[in-house]
């Protein structure tokens, strides 16, 4: 599943399907 852009404006790799949130990882 793809992830939306995080608050920092970067694509995140880890996502939570329950709340559909994304965390930015470098």
From Swiss-Prot:
List the cysteine pairs that form cystine. 3-22
Question: Where, per UniProt, does this protein localize?
Answer: Secreted
Tissues in which the protein is found = Expressed by the venom gland.
Q: Which domain of life does this protein belong to?
A: Eukaryota
Keywords from the UniProt entry: Acetylcholine receptor inhibiting toxin, Disulfide bond, Ion channel impairing toxin, Neurotoxin, Postsynaptic neurotoxin, Secreted, Toxin
Molecular function GO terms recorded:
acetylcholine receptor inhibitor activity; ion channel regulator activity; toxin activity
Cellular component terms, GO, for this chain's entry? extracellular region
Q: Which family does it belong to?
A: Belongs to the three-finger toxin family. Short-chain subfamily.
Q: What does this protein do?
A: Binds and may inhibit nicotinic acetylcholine receptors (nAChR).
Instruction: Please state what the protein is called.
Output: Nicotinic acetylcholine receptor-binding protein Mnn-1A
Q: Which organism is it from?
A: Micrurus nigrocinctus (Central American coral snake)
